[in-house]
Amino acid sequence: MKIQADSIVARKSYNCDILFRVVHIHEDSQIVDLIGEEMRLSADAPLSDLVLMPEEEKNKLRNQLKKKVDRSFRLFRQDFKLLQQKREYVSTGGYKHDERYFELPGKVLHVDGDNRYLEKCLQLYEKLGVPVVGVHMSEADMPQRVPKLLDQVRPDVLVITGHDAFLKMKGGKKDLQAYRHSKHFVRTVKEVRTKIRHLDQLVIFAGACQSHFESLIKAGANFASSPERVNIHALDPVYIVSKICLTSFMDRVHVMDVLRNTLSNEGGLGGVETRGLLRTGMPIEKDLEKQEDLPSN
């Protein structure tokens, strides 16, 4: 078979460690634009360095990642149940009774430079019970378009992500111009923070694979990638912000508590201590619950 757009390939020079999807082949230079199949990585490579992955090898790599994804989901659900038990105890004053209470988690605006990743993320938000509005746009359009979306959606949390990469030939790790899309993420965060300055009023996650972590945090992001300029998984932003959305506003979330259930951990992700967003209320009548569709315990 011939390598073409949408082919799933790997790079021989990197021991075929990551699956990529072919975006475009430049016929004149024989350079191929690539995006990670599961990682938020943007790259290019000579056509001669690429190999079509056999179905068996693709499934092997996908299954390895799926085990990590399933583990992260299990750990997150365990944490969520513990948080839920704590909230129920606090809401009822430690007494057992038949009253039902409702929960209002933080609302997410998830802006993604990759439409396929966006769909995967939206499915995970739904499984975790986090309200979300998802928007697909190119990373370059984000600085201009995202601030306008805030007025329409009025989110508690903003996710700014897509693809990125550190390009050694363009400069050192401290040089923002040596990154494919970090400058767009940084500009977006700065624009948003001119509207909403307080870190607990709007929680921001920004970045993708190998992004310029320090610049994103300095611009005003609560959480960002990538401290060690490593790759992050497509679903990592979801786990980070969902932890904030489902933690009581009475509690502060420590960075390690957020990172331990992600697929990338502290090498790929970091941030600052942030207040939770979830609020509980009671009572709620069963017929009203059905009518208003309030999320209940």
Residue spans for each PLM region:
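Short, acidic/turn-prone active-site loops that include or flank metal/cofactor-
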Residues: 137-140, 227-236
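Catalytic cores of nucleophile-dependent amide-cleaving enzymes
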Residues: 186-232
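Proline-aspartate-enriched helix->loop->beta-strand connector
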Residues: 150-163, 221
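SH3/SH3-like beta-barrel fold
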Residues: 22, 30-40, 45
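Short beta-strand-centered aromatic/proline hotspots
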Residues: 16-26
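Charge-patterned, long linear interaction tracts outside catalytic cores
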Residues: 204-219, 277-297
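Intrinsically disordered, low-complexity, charged/polar segments
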Residues: 38-94
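Short, well-ordered loop/turn sites that connect or cap secondary structure elements
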Residues: 2-4
